[in-house]
UniProtKB/Swiss-Prot annotation:
Gene3D superfamilies: 2.60.120.970, Cystine-knot cytokines. The keyword Disulfide bond applies. Expressed in femur, calvaria, trachea, lung and ovary. This is Bone morphogenetic protein 2. It comes from Rattus norvegicus. Its main location: secreted. One of its GO terms (molecular function) is protein domain specific binding. InterPro entries: BMP2_TGF_beta-like, Cystine-knot_cytokine, TGF-b_C, TGF-b_propeptide, TGF-beta-rel, TGFb_CS.
Amino acid sequence: MVAGTRCLLVLLLPQVLLGGAAGLIPELGRKKFAGASRPLSRPSEDVLSEFELRLLSMFGLKQRPTPSKDVVVPPYMLDLYRRHSGQPGALAPDHRLERAASRANTVLSFHHEEAIEELSEMSGKTSRRFFFNLSSVPTDEFLTSAELQIFREQMQEALGNSSFQHRINIYEIIKPATASSKFPVTRLLDTRLVTQNTSQWESFDVTPAVMRWTAQGHTNHGFVVEVAHLEEKPGVSKRHVRISRSLHQDEHSWSQVRPLLVTFGHDGKGHPLHKREKRQAKHKQRKRLKSSCKRHPLYVDFSDVGWNDWIVAPPGYHAFYCHGECPFPLADHLNSTNHAIVQTLVNSVNSKIPKACCVPTELSAISMLYLDENEKVVLKNYQDMVVEGCGCR
């Protein structure tokens, strides 16, 4: 059975058995269930638990996530989801971001631990140490890239003035500071000269460091983010390059601009993230019997199975399903294989041989944004979730 079809059956069956399938079963199916001569039996809790575990396993989860209500989804991840699901409202295309996502099917985001240490604020520079706990990065996942996102805010004084510049340097800490050595031993990873005439996120490549920490077993001592103030007073730059939380800043506003580490990886399953586009019909619809094999509407609503508290987006999706007869002789529009044609021919003279079946012949992926068991925000591409075409096989 095709993986995507099996996934949908697992999702639909408990809903059908429980009689709560209003949002998951097409109208025709609901009428059939409503008119059944005997009531449906209620499955045991063990059966329902097994169904849920199988579906969670397909998502790569060991248990159902139960995130707290205080978890904030970074705006960067929401925009990344919009980009790759083809939704309006996404920011302008970012070629560097597109390149990173083109080799990955999983994106993870991490906030730094708040107990950061201000290393120095002298000689026109402000430095801070950032530590990101990467223990939840899957060991069996191939890391394709990693980026540190730093937000910089617009300065009114910088409008029309290119002299308001800062240099942001990102270092990997090779050896932390000790009692005998005041400063850590570091390695430069990336650097950027920025102006403060606009508000935007700056992306820095930290792939080598994250690769050493996650794949090569090196100790993660964190990063040093250094802001060099060019022709500026340090205090002004410190407020506008957001590497620390303001004294009276509330949790929500800080969550919108706090630094973010993003990893791009591939688990070896399916294709990389891509922008989903609406497919055009390959040929005009021909006259066909109402009962012939074709695609039918089916909308899967995650709130119907109580998963809308950890699946951020989409709220549901159009999965579709295949249903209908494969009559003899098989017409061209039924998208049949030679084997199906032969099987149908034999069935016409020998009823012991079953007819060809109406099944999905083409499936596509969807992107999902969700919170995992560790309350980490994940963007992942799942294969074989949408039926694009049906045929007799």
